[in-house]
Design a protein with these regions (language model features):
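Short aromatic/hydrophobic "clamp" motif used to bind/position activated sugar donors
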Residues: 386
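Conserved donor NDP-sugar-binding/catalytic core segment of glycosyltransferases
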Residues: 398-429, 493, 499, 505
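Aromatic-rich peripheral "rim/lid" segments of glycoside hydrolase catalytic domains that contact
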Residues: 259-307
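Active-site mouth of glycoside hydrolases
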Residues: 23-189
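A conserved acidic beta->alpha catalytic loop
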Residues: 329, 344-352, 393
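A recurrent flexible, glycine/aromatic-enriched loop bordering the glycosyltransferase active site
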Residues: 421-422, 439-462, 466, 475-476, ...
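Short, acidic, metal-binding catalytic loop of nucleotide-sugar glycosyltransferases
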Residues: 328-337
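Extracellular glycoside hydrolase catalytic/binding regions
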Residues: 146, 151-250, 280
């Protein structure tokens, strides 16, 4: 049993630690955990596993003098240690130990006893002001987790969390995990803690990025880092601790604990004498690492001598309602080298008057749209790095520090970070934040992004100017996507720092949300028109990376997650691998699902007058039910991941309705601006190019030698200029380039080059078709239904399915002609030589090879003069 602390503490009011985004706060001030571990120590006569009070006082005084502000204990400390911590302004992470090293879930009574002891231990601390948080476990052995399975362990840890919250609801509660069980899903804890021992700076940096992405917009604390000085020497220990601390804070962690304060360590009934992890020796003599650690802790979060100059650019149009929050947030930035430029894009409200109250540069322009305003900011910026933030967002105080750290330690051309809804926003705004269609980032790796949203978008000025700035075509949305693609096409990478965050207000009304989603639908249409090769037949973008952020769609999973344990559970880093979602189950989330339901509604309504069509009501109800079920499933999943604490019926109902409404708004914007499933892309129709089941070979003679890669890149760029969706062949594909125009068919090209000496080349380009199985199956099914309906004289159904089948056959033929013509023209355009002075020309989209009108003069024999060579390929179809 635990003895309770002095009851007088209950009557003393004090501020508790709270979580805000990625960090801890106390008294509205950010609190970086700069900690050391303390213990465990050999038991005293009274059973306490801590040194005598005089020793603790000396230790805590030395800690405080060296910039340490937090102490982690592995057992509940005695009263004097709490009071001593308060005296020296130290906070405590209190471990609540229990027998996690045995099969503790076998016996229900043992589980209840553990929960009871953890609860009593928390009560015994009596809400002492020195408490930072409670840790209800530390590294449950991986074999135990594997023995019971992750879900049972997670469920038991949730019970321990609830037990502490019942006796101290305002206390922060965590669990200390480690890489071998990183797959545990513990989002119910207040923040995440990991013990990580890596002796390579690059590996530590990469693993911290991984942990940030695994656990999202929550504080991450490394609960143990360090190095043994007995085996590595004091010099090496000091060197490693220096870069460990700088990396931990530079990568955006909320804090860390050095293991340990002293070499004195007692475990398992024995004094451990063959490990020396301490900053001081057993007799409390400082090691070389102590002043190094102290110096590193005084330069947080970024310890860099040469920081870049930032130009923070805010573009606003009638943003008076939120611009003050933005200006106040920028005013609180702790970064030493930056300017703020506000572009007033023809606002008609009071935004200019508000901005004039702050020491920033205000530039007033006509209402030319968001992209134009961003370019105005770029052209007037003094900084080498441009940091764009929306007028309805405001930055975390070290936003620029983290961006600077990321730029200094990488070669990225651009950099982004998360955008989080402010905790003070209300129910509706939080529902919108958790709904689909919000500003999210897409990551290719833990540190490299494919897309970063414009509300938190930074880029090197020379990089942005090199790619031509933002495209004025996008007046309100889509500009960030287009810019990201052009930056990557120019050969640069886009980085992501998980703690370079901004607080972003979401739409606070359903009308505003509807308007926003319609605008995003319009932006999708404009992007598809400019980048058709990135979209599929239905007009949807297939990201190469993984989408992070709220509002994700959850499909029915046919496969379970797989955990990599290693042989016999021996892997040091054990991760969970999630199977990709099934395409079939993702179809109901597409806006076009509403078109499908509308198509079913037509015969359903007709069934009121034609009894044979009443079956359509079943199909329509099924389609609607599938969509509503998926919306409820996704809304519940999003709610579980949300930071919103009030998980009420109203919140979940609004969230579900937003999941239902969002595709309609998106579809409205897409259809209105031409992004339809029946749109035409590519070189158009030419009946002479209609070949479906045989191959064709096209040829080209060149007097100038080029590599196969260069020829293929030229063909690819020609196809892009024809607004064709292009895909490169992969490492296992026996084709080089694929084009697709619609739903049912795609054409593939394979290049071979004959070398004829004197730099002369003869190119052969074989093209054939790859047909959609789904298209054939659909047409066959409709044909069968039509035949059966005619056989039984059910003419209404027969006519309907016949008409639908004829439409699909016509669509199939047009798609086949289009892709055939596109691939042919893309190759034959090689007959136009590029002027060397304009071989690479920058346009708003990126870098393109532009064909000139003058054809290449060749010396081919007459029988080679034809561009096209027809060959019988009965047995040479492409794989």
């Amino acid at each position: 049993m635990y003895e309770p602390l002095s009851l007088k503490l209950h009557s003393t009011h004090y501020e508790r630690f709270v979580i805000k985004g990625k960090f801890l706060y106390k008294n509205n001030l950010k609190f970086y955990i700069k900690g050391v571990t303390y213990g465990t120590f050999a038991p005293q006569i009274d059973g306490q596993q801590f040194p005598l009070e005089a020793v603790v006082e000396k230790d805590f005084a030395m800690m405080s003098a060296n910039g340490i502000n937090t102490v982690r204990t592995y057992t509940v400390p005695p009263i004097y240690l709490f009071d001593m911590a308060e005296k020296f302004n130290l906070s405590l992470m209190v471990g609540l130990p229990w027998e996690q090293h045995i099969t503790f879930l076998d016996d229900t009574s043992r589980q209840e006893a553990i929960i009871s002891r953890v609860s009593e231990a928390a009560i015994s601390c009596n809400q002492h002001p020195a408490i930072l948080c409670f840790a209800v476990g530390n590294e449950i052995p991986a074999p135990m987790v594997r023995w019971y399975g992750a879900k049972k362990i997670e469920a038991f840890l949730k019970k321990l969390y609830d037990a502490v919250k019942e006796v101290d609801n305002e206390a922060l509660v965590t669990y200390v995990n480690y890489p071998t069980t990183e797959y545990l899903k513990l989002s119910f804890f207040d923040f995440d803690c990991f013990n990580v021992y890596l002796e390579s700076q690059a590996k530590l940096s990469a693993y911290i990025s991984r942990l940030h992405n695994l656990y999202g917009n929550r504080p991450l604390v490394l609960a143990e880092i360090g190095l043994d000085s007995m085996r590595n020497g004091e010099d090496r220990q000091a060197e490693v601790l220096k870069w460990q601390i700088e990396t931990v804070f530079g990568k955006g962690c909320a804090g860390m604990f050095v293991f340990a304060w002293t070499d004195e360590w007692w475990r398992g009934g024995f004094e451990i004498e063959d490990w020396d992890f301490g900053l001081v020796t057993r007799d409390r003599q400082p090691k070389l690492a102590l002043p190094v650690v102290s110096n590193s802790l005084n330069k947080l979060p970024v310890n860099e001598s040469h920081l870049p100059f930032f130009s923070v650019i805010v573009c606003t149009y009638n943003g008076a309602a939120t611009i003050r929050d933005c200006m106040e947030g920028l005013k609180r930035l702790q970064y030493p080298l930056f300017e703020v430029i506000v572009i007033n894009d023809g606002s008609t409200d009071q935004v200019a008057d508000i901005v004039k109250e702050y020491p920033v540069r205000l530039i007033n322009t006509k209402n030319n749209g968001l992209s134009s305003a961003r370019n105005t900011g770029m052209n007037n910026a003094k900084g080498s790095i441009l940091a764009y933030i929306d007028d309805d967002a405001y930055p975390e105080e070290h936003w620029l520090h983290y961006l600077a750290y990321a730029y200094i330690h990488s070669r990225h051309g651009a950099m982004g970070g998360p955008n989080i809804i402010p905790p003070e926003d209300g129910l509706l705004a939080q529902s919108v934040a958790d709904a689909p269609g919000g500003p999210v980032h897409v990551l290719l790796t833990d540190e490299i992004a494919e897309h970063i949203p414009g509300c938190n978008f930074s880029v090197k000025k020379d990089v942005l100017m090199k790619v031509g700035g933002f495209d004025p075509l996008y007046r309100s949305a889509g500009d960030d996507v287009d810019a990201c693609w052009r930056i990557q096409e120019a050969g640069y990478t886009i980085g992501y720092h998980p703690s370079a965050l901004v607080w972003h207000h979401r739409r606070n009304s359903l009308k505003a949300y509807w308007k926003q989603q319609k605008g995003y639908g319009k932006a999708e249409a404009l992007l598809e028109l400019k980048w058709p090769e990135r979209y599929n037949g239905l007009g949807h973008l297939a990201w190469a990376g993984c989408i992070y952020g709220g509002g994700g769609n959850v499909t029915v999973q046919t496969k379970k997650d797989k955990i990599f344990y290693g042989t016999w559970g021996s892997a040091a880093f054990q991760s969970v691998y999630q199977p990709g979602s099934n395409f079939i189950f993702s179809i109901p989330f597409m806006p076009e699902w509403y078109l499908f339901m509308a198509m079913l509604l037509v015969p359903s309504v007709a069934g009121i007058f034609v009894p044979t069509l009443q079956w359509a009501w079943v199909a329509f109800a099924s389609a609607l039910g599938i969509f509503v079920f998926q919306a409820i499933l996704s809304a519940n999943s999003s709610a579980k991941k949300s930071a919103w604490q009030q998980q009420t019926f109203t919140y979940k109902f609004i969230l579900t309705m937003l999941y239902i409404v969002q595709p309609v708004a998106r579809l409205t914007g897409r259809l209105k601006h031409g992004l339809t499933p029946w749109r035409k892309r590519g070189a158009g129709l030419q009946l002479s190019n209609f070949y479906c089941f045989n191959s064709r070979v096209f040829t080209h003679w060149s007097e100038e030698w080029l590599s196969a890669e260069t020829w293929l890149e030229m063909i690819e760029q020609n196809l892009i200029s024809l607004r064709t969706r292009v895909l490169r062949g992969g490492a296992f594909d026996r084709w080089d380039i694929q084009v697709r125009s619609g739903w049912f068919t795609r054409a593939r090209g394979l290049l071979v080059i004959e070398e004829h000496g004197a730099n002369k080349q003869f190119l052969k380009f074989r093209c054939n078709h790859k047909h959609s199985r789904y298209g054939f199956i659909t047409i066959i099914l409709l044909s069968i239904i039509t035949f059966v309906a005619g056989l039984y004289n059910i003419w209404a159904i027969g006519v309907f399915t016949l008409f639908l089948g004829m439409l699909l056959v016509a669509k199939y033929i047009m798609d086949s002609i289009s892709v055939s013509n596109s691939l042919k023209k893309g190759f034959l355009m090689l007959g136009y030589k590029n002027d060397t002075s304009s071989e690479l020309k920058m346009v708003s989209k990126g870098i393109h090879l532009l064909p000139l009108e003058k054809p290449i003069q060749t010396t081919l024999p007459d029988w080679f003069d034809k561009h096209e060579l027809q060959i019988d390929h009965k047995s040479t179809t492409s794989n």
